[in-house]
Swiss-Prot record:
Coiled coil: none annotated. Keywords: Methylation, Ribonucleoprotein, Ribosomal protein, RNA-binding, rRNA-binding. The keyword Ribonucleoprotein applies. Belongs to the universal ribosomal protein uL3 family. One of its GO terms (biological process) is translation. Part of the 50S ribosomal subunit. Forms a cluster with proteins L14 and L19. One of the primary rRNA binding proteins, it binds directly near the 3'-end of the 23S rRNA, where it nucleates assembly of the 50S subunit. GO terms for molecular function: rRNA binding; structural constituent of ribosome. The keyword Phosphoprotein does not apply. This is Large ribosomal subunit protein uL3. The gene is rplC. PROSITE patterns: RIBOSOMAL_L3. It comes from the Bacteria. The modification N5-methylglutamine is found at Q156. It comes from Maricaulis maris (strain MCS10).
Amino acid sequence: MRQEDRRTGVVARKLGMTRIFAEDGSHVPCTVLHMDNVQVVSHKTADRDGYVALQLGAGEAKAKRTPKAMRGHFAKAKVAPKRKLVEFRVAEDALIEVGSELTADHFVPGQKVDVAGISIGKGFAGAMKRHGFGGLRATHGVSISHRSHGSTGQCQDPGKVFKGKKMAGHMGAVRVTTQNIEVVRVDVERGIVLVKGAVPGSAGGWVELRDAIKGHGGTELPLPGKFRTLDELNAPVTAEVVENEAAPADADNAAPEAAADGEEGTQA
């Protein structure tokens, strides 16, 4: 993919896996990804920030549990507080208006995408499970250490174990990117994107979905993308609306302080 053709990706929630049937009767395993009200929150520009990018927000967060600085950040964009914020670098002509909502038809069936997420944690794992080692022999002098990794180095020279040596250790819970996954189907009304095969992470986790860096498979893609602007959406969120939603939490926090001040005045 050329730098000047780079579109924004989206952040989606992994709902789980299913299967769909092809015309020849074969079944295709698919992962269901949900675009939960993905909106543009802010822009990064080359003049101000040194690079061009879009900041996207997805999901709903309670205003009373959102820090005041972030409430102002969302109110400036006229969007409700978001649970997840992600940034995607884009070409200058691929910037999308702040407040716009990206839709599922941003991706086209048949195109290739890259999906990044946090893999499922497996805890401490041995070398056979973690790296696929074959282990040691079952007999002929091997005792207890059948599943060990064996020698970790050479002789007195170099006399050390090199960094990055494949050994037992913590497995999973790291960022993983699966490349060149095919988009099978999209549902604009439900905000659903079906991709072929498995993607990193557990059900309910967040993943980043973007055009494949190694090519989109020759499919014509909409530029700068498919979205609904603020004018096409419902009434935009203003700063007053966000602050009013957060007012009960601020009042609860202020009540103990007021009570403490009253007790001090009575004692005086």
